[in-house]
């Protein structure tokens, strides 16, 4: 159905492509940013086609209206010796009123029908055998990612397998919120989906090529809305299997960092965070079992490095204003011990 609608829109979309290219940026350049014009997933391709169709129609309207405006300004500009007699008026002209009523109605009707067809094509999919089920929960200001069938809990990184002809593997996302309204959006994979307290929404993606894609919260949710980022990592089928196996393993119990482990369990850390295989089972903050396997800290606001981790433990709000994690007022020795322990959680 999506394919049929795209054929209807193809000629107008071509004009939209020309306008977009003229506006600046190559396809290669756009692919490096979270853009709906660089899709890598089946639903995102449909969204781009619809966007190009709408851009094409509105581009034609702009050219016609702007062209007429320029023509009128030039053709009827004031000249020396102009006849100042009032020209014939067209107020009440039935033909003109019909034209400026019927033409916009036809344009809106076409946009409505094509959009409805795309929406049905994108949202009409239901989970099927072989699909991956993931639950995404928005928090202020981070993302909790759960894989119910795999027993995996992580944060701020969505890992999914690529879908190919040999092994089609769509991913179906259950989107929820633990506090206020958020909106889950990875432009290159799918459209926005609101995360609303006490409500469950569904979204599906079907990535067609491996890679790393950037997303963000698209609904204002407080002081760190702009810092509520996430990353989608699309693996090959075999790489995803290895990633899942590593995430299912319990946390390492390294004897060299026993002081940091004891400190983690004795402070409020274990009341807010979970580390699988330990007494730490808090649910208010991200699961830290494999913290160091993630690329960023603070929901994408900084790279995950030993130095940044130590700075975060020392004073989270200095790095992410409004972060709900309090400063623990640790001594330098305690900071070193706690950092050393967390660095083993891979």
What are these language model-derived features?
Residues 2, 345-346:
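Short, solvent-exposed mixed-charge patches
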Residues 13-22, 62, 105-109, 113:
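Hydrophobic alpha-helical membrane-insertion segments
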Residues 1-31:
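N-terminal secretory/membrane targeting signals
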Residues 28-53, 73-283, 298-321, 326-339:
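Non-transmembrane, membrane-proximal soluble domains of secreted or membrane proteins
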Residues 51-78:
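Alpha-helical transmembrane segments
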């Amino acid at each position: 159905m999506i394919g049929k609608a795209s054929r209807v829109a193809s000629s107008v979309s071509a004009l939209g492509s020309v306008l977009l290219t003229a506006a600046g940026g190559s396809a290669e350049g756009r692919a490096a940013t979270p853009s709906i014009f660089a899709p890598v997933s089946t639903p995102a391709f449909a969204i781009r086609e619809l966007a190009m169709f709408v851009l094409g129609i509105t581009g034609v309207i702009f050219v016609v209206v702007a062209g007429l405006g320029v023509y009128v300004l030039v053709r009827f500009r004031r000249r020396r010796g102009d006849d100042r007699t009032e020209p014939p008026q067209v107020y009440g002209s039935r033909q003109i009123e019909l034209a400026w009523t019927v033409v916009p109605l036809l344009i809106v009707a076409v946009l409505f029908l094509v959009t409805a067809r795309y929406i049905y094509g994108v949202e009409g999919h239901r989970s099927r055998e072989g699909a991956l089920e993931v639950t995404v929960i928005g928090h202020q200001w981070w993302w909790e990612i759960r894989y119910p069938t795999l027993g995996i809990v992580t944060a701020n990184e969505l890992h999914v397998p690529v879908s190919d002809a040999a092994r089609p593997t769509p991913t179906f996302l259950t989107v929820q919120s633990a506090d206020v309204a958020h909106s889950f959006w990875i432009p290159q994979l799918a459209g926005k989906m609101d995360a609303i307290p006490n409500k469950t929404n569904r979204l599906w993606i079907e990535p067609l090529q491996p890679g790393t894609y950037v997303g963000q919260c698209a609904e204002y949710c407080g002081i760190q809305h702009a810092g509520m980022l996430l990353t989608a990592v699309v693996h090959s089928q075999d790489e995803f299997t290895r990633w899942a196996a590593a995430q299912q393993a319990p946390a390492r119990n390294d004897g060299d960092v026993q002081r940091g482990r004891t400190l983690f369990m004795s402070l409020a850390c274990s009341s807010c965070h979970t580390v699988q295989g330990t007494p730490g089972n808090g649910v208010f903050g991200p699961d830290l079992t494999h913290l160091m396997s993630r690329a960023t800290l603070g929901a994408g606001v900084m790279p995950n490095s030993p130095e940044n981790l130590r700075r975060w433990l020392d004073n989270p709000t200095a790095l992410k204003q409004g972060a709900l994690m309090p400063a623990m007022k640790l001594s330098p020795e305690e900071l070193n011990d706690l950092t050393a322990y967390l660095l083993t959680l891979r």
